[in-house]
Every structure is written in C-alpha cells, then in structure tokens.
Amino acid sequence: SYVLNNPLNLTDPSGYSFLSKYWRTIAAIVVTVYTGGLAAGAATSWAAAGWSIGGGFVAGAIQTNSLRGGVYGAFSAGVFSGIGTAFGNMAQTGAYSANALRIGKVVAHGMAGGVMNSLQGGKFGHGFASAGVTQTFSPGIDRIDAGNMGFSAQRTLAAATLGGTVSAMTGGKFANGAVT
C-alpha cells in the first residue's frame, strides 16, 4: 500500500526531478549554513572573516561548478562580513544613532548586493533589492530562534529564503539572492 501496489507509481521516467535542477543551490546553502556556524564561534573578526570567505568560496564553487564561482562567493562573503563588522564596530562607539546605523547598514548591504550581482552578469537593481530587503527584515529574522545567541540554521535559512524570493520577484535568480 506504500505506492498503492504499483512500484512505478512514484518514479520519474524522464529522469528529471527538482533535485537535478536545484542540487547545486541546495548544496551551496547547506555549506553556507555550516561554515557560517563555524564563523560564529570565531574569537576574532579576522578569524570570522576567514571562515566566511572560505565558506563563500566553497558555496560559490559548488553552485557554479567553477573556480570563478568560488572566487565570487569568497569575495561576496568577505564584503558582507566586512559590512557587518564595520557597522558592529560603529554601534559600539555610540557616535551614531540606532536609526542612522540601521539605514546605513541597509544601504551598504544593498550596494554590495547590487555590485556583486552586476559582477556576476546580473542587474544591479536585482542584487540591491535582494540584499537591501533582506537586511531590512533582519531584525525580524533575528527573532527566529532568539534563545540561541550564536549561529542559527533557522535564521540563515530564513534570510536565504527571503533574499532568494526577493531576487526572483524582481526578475533575478533565486539562487543568487539566496546565497548573497
């Protein structure tokens, strides 16, 4: 009764399934989730940046099956890690209001996302919207698994889903938005 007594009922005779089309994107997101977790426990910002860049390289290489994709992934991870570190340091100084930092961080993420998307042959606006909107909703995403002060796979997957969805809605690729 598992397959209603027809073992061929749940097969795909064409050999094509959603996994054959999306396995690289899924693998890249999984690598990003796990290497992000390693970066969360890093003692210094340089170590965290190193883990982020390494994870970005592996995720980009898996997604594109190329060294070029790995380099883009590493560069993208380094840029976004640097933005997060810079705004974290500015917040600690107390020289800027919380609203100014929030707006600045959204714009910085949007600009970085736009540039990264342009470098990969996409449109600046798609990358800007994807990264900017994801950063805009980051306070809500941060409330997911709020008891976990370190790395959270749930938060990472929520951000990847939001970024990919915004990218797809603006005419870009889901995978580009999910990874950045």
Language-model features: where?
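Acidic glycine-/aspartate-rich tracts in secreted/extracellular proteins
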Residues: P7-L8
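Extended, hydrophobic alpha-helical membrane-active domains that insert into or remodel lipid bilayers
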Residues: T11-T180
